[in-house]
UniProtKB/Swiss-Prot annotation:
Residue ranges of coiled coil: none
Disulfide bridge map: 2-16, 3-12, 8-15
Signal peptide: none
Family that this chain belongs to: Belongs to the conotoxin M superfamily.
Top-level division of the source organism's lineage: Eukaryota
Protein name: Conotoxin tx3d
Keyword Transcription: no
């Protein structure tokens, strides 16, 4: 899974 602010910054969506 891709969760966390760092994940969002890496273009991982949707963000948890």
């Amino acid at each position: 899974g891709c969760c966390g602010a760092f994940a969002c910054r890496f273009g991982c969506t949707p963000c948890c």
